Regions:
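Intrinsic low-complexity, intrinsically disordered segments enriched in polar/basic residues
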Residues: 2-3, 204
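Extracytoplasmic cell-surface/polysaccharide-interacting catalytic and binding patches
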Residues: 22-135, 139-290
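Sec-dependent N-terminal signal peptides of Gram-positive bacterial secreted proteins and lipoproteins
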Residues: 3-22
Length: 290
């Protein structure tokens, strides 16, 4: 409404002033020509124009972790929730648990865990059993895994294990979810994408706030091989936008940071976006005007 009123005021002022400003005083512009001169799509001062509303963007949920945006050793210090092994009675989930690929302790952020339970329950109702293979990993654990992978590959990073600080798992929002047929497999690879469970996850994960973190056609951007099993919780609004537009989290972050910069340049309140700002701190440090 404010934008419309401003536009109408501009039209009124232009209609009064333009006859005077014209090179030929007798030449008057039509109303259509005057309206064309007014940019109705120009953002208002301090207006947030990104497709996902500010109130729907949780800084923790959309935090990017890769080798250019490294997490600190103590990045997440809030209590994590221990994953419960699913207990069923008459087909109903009686303890708010999920199927686990192993008996070890696994932890996630609360919102992510609740969403994973909901997603797993929905999959089971559709005839698919999902198993959580891996959840939160500390910086130290990831560092050990990365070094072991390098040793196995003669010092070469083959794109299967992230370096410490670059792993989604350190956020407490990354989940490796696999079908039963892969429980005894010695490793995981992109062939898993053909499994009905993974096809179901790719089609429905955004409904529960998850994205496929490392898509098949985005390896150059993520610098990680395609992982159809790796879900990342970002919240339903962000997940819907990312999946519907075929983005990876890196592309989403690029768009988000550009929107933040535009918002601030137009007089936006910095305190509203401060925690969403991310600056490269890893192998490549790009320019930023934040």
């Amino acid at each position: 409404m404010k934008k419309l009123l401003c536009a109408l005021l501009c039209v009124f002022l232009l209609s009064a002033a333009l006859p005077v400003l014209c090179e030929d005083p007798e030449e008057e512009l039509s109303m259509d020509e005057i309206v064309e001169a007014v940019d109705l799509d120009a953002p208002e001062a301090g207006e947030w124009t990104f497709p996902v509303a500010l109130e729907d963007l949780n800084p923790d949920f959309v935090r990017l972790a890769n080798k250019h945006y490294l997490l600190e050793k103590d990045y997440y210090t809030k209590p994590l929730v221990k994953v419960k092994a699913l207990k069923l009675k008459n087909g109903e989930n009686t303890n708010g648990g999920v199927r686990k690929a192993s008996g070890g302790t696994m932890e996630l952020q609360q919102d992510c865990y609740e969403a994973l339970v909901a997603l797993s329950d929905a999959a089971r109702e559709d005839g698919y059993n999902l198993y959580l293979k891996s959840a939160y990993r500390s910086w130290q654990t990831q560092n050990t895994m990365y070094k072991n992978r390098l040793k196995k590959n003669n010092g070469k990073d083959d794109g299967w294990v992230s370096k410490a600080g670059a792993s989604d798992h350190q956020t407490g929002l990354g989940c490796d979810v696999i079908p039963k047929s892969w429980l005894k497999a010695s490793g995981m690879n992109s062939k898993m994408a053909k499994e009905p469970e993974c096809i179901w996850m790719a089609e429905h994960c955004q409904e529960y706030g998850f994205i496929i973190r490392y898509p098949a056609d985005k390896e150059e951007m993520t610098e990680i091989n395609y992982e159809p099993w790796h879900l990342r919780y970002v919240g339903i609004p962000a997940a819907t936008y990312i999946m519907e537009n075929g983005l990876c989290l890196e592309e989403f972050n690029d768009e988000l940071q550009a929107a933040i910069q535009e918002y601030l340049e137009n007089g936006g309140d910095r305190s509203k976006v401060e925690k969403l700002i991310q600056v490269p701190n890893g192998e490549y440090k790009g320019k930023t005007s934040f």
